[in-house]
Amino acid sequence: MNPVPAQREYFLDSIRAWLMLLGIPFHISLIYSSHTWHVNSAEPSLWLTLFNDFIHSFRMQVFFVISGYFSYMLFLRYPLKKWWKVRVERVGIPMLTAIPLLTLPQFIMLQYVKGKAESWPGLSLYDKYNTLAWELISHLWFLLVLVVMTTLCVWIFKRIRNNLENSDKTNKKFSMVKLSVIFLCLGIGYAVIRRTIFIVYPPILSNGMFNFIVMQTLFYLPFFILGALAFIFPHLKTLFTTPSRGCTLAAALAFVAYLLNQRYGSGDAWMYETESVITMVLGLWMVNVVFSFGHRLLNFQSARVTYFVNASLFIYLVHHPLTLFFGAYITPHITSNWLGFLCGLIFVVGIAIILYEIHLRIPLLKFLFSGKPVVKRENDKAPAR
């Protein structure tokens, strides 16, 4: 096994946590945006729509880069089989726990909120399966994608490690221009694959499991591998943590293009393919923007930050049904969109933190929502004096 850096990457821990927690304002603003969701306010807000689009345009790309970084770090720490087992347990167990405890009750609630409970028995077997796939995976999709990526990277990481043993990694040089060209080509390649599927057999694109396991994995895998490469090559990591005006300007222009595509694109035309190209390069440039910002402001140890780093996954898991409950039963009684948005944040975050504190005191729930076995400290075993 290769040695791993002893110094903790505090800024990456913090960025990953805040990207996770950013899902809360993202989903609450979705209620008040012009995008159609499970629940929506009576009138959409232009500014909350813009805020929602901004978060959606880059958040998960950067998240998967950090996930790839830490995954390769653990890959060097553990034997291959143990690495796969540890990684799959840490994302798979919380996902499987959240389905019966969170997304199933959420699905049942939405059936009645949207008036679809009566029509459920009339659906075909496939429609029931596909509906359950979309609704039960729901916001847990990234955990499923991480399980798939981890399995694929059993082979990919081995190939990377073997290639490194036969080459001098100190001579590897990266530039943002080269990376931009590569990710532009990856975006075009993904768009070609999607368009080909759309032409050959369009119904498969509406299949929930195909979307999560194949299409989402295919799109985010380059970012996951990029994170692993950032761990391997210090020069690449420095490239991301060094502020770049070019990346900031390019990201801003790409976001404008993203908005224009959202506004004028058509789902029956090339809107989704265009979006994949834009968000592929936008995600790359935002890695530099977010990493450099986080490296400058978040690279320190703090008890408060550590608390939210540890709590971020649980809070994210429970926030989604809380958000939908708020949107279905409380939003209609608040006339102001901005007031509703702020009340939603207080409602969801407040209850999520309370639930987090409760679950910490129940060892079984603590294990199920983290995938980590509860380890008793030696002090706990010592008899009281």
UniProtKB/Swiss-Prot annotation:
Keywords: Acyltransferase, Cell membrane, Membrane, Transferase, Transmembrane, Transmembrane helix. It comes from the Bacteria. It is an enzyme of class 2 (transferase). It is found in: Cell membrane. One of its GO terms (biological process) is glucan biosynthetic process. It is a multi-pass membrane protein. Pathway: Glycan metabolism; osmoregulated periplasmic glucan (OPG) biosynthesis. Its main location: membrane. The chain crosses the membrane at residues 17-37, 60-80, 91-111, 137-157, 173-193, 212-232, 239-259, 274-294, 311-331, 338-358. GO terms for molecular function: acyltransferase activity, transferring groups other than amino-acyl groups; transferase activity, transferring one-carbon groups. GO terms for cellular component: plasma membrane. The keyword Transmembrane helix applies. The keyword Transferase applies. Its EC number is 2.1.-.-. InterPro entries: Acyl_transf_3_dom (IPR002656), Glucan_succinyl_AcylTrfase (IPR050623), Glucans_biosynth_C (IPR023723). NCBIfam families: PRK03854.1. Necessary for the succinyl substitution of periplasmic glucans. Could catalyze the transfer of succinyl residues from the cytoplasmic side of the membrane to the nascent glucan backbones on the periplasmic side of the membrane. Belongs to the acyltransferase 3 family. OpgC subfamily. This is Glucans biosynthesis protein C. It comes from Escherichia coli O17:K52:H18 (strain UMN026 / ExPEC).
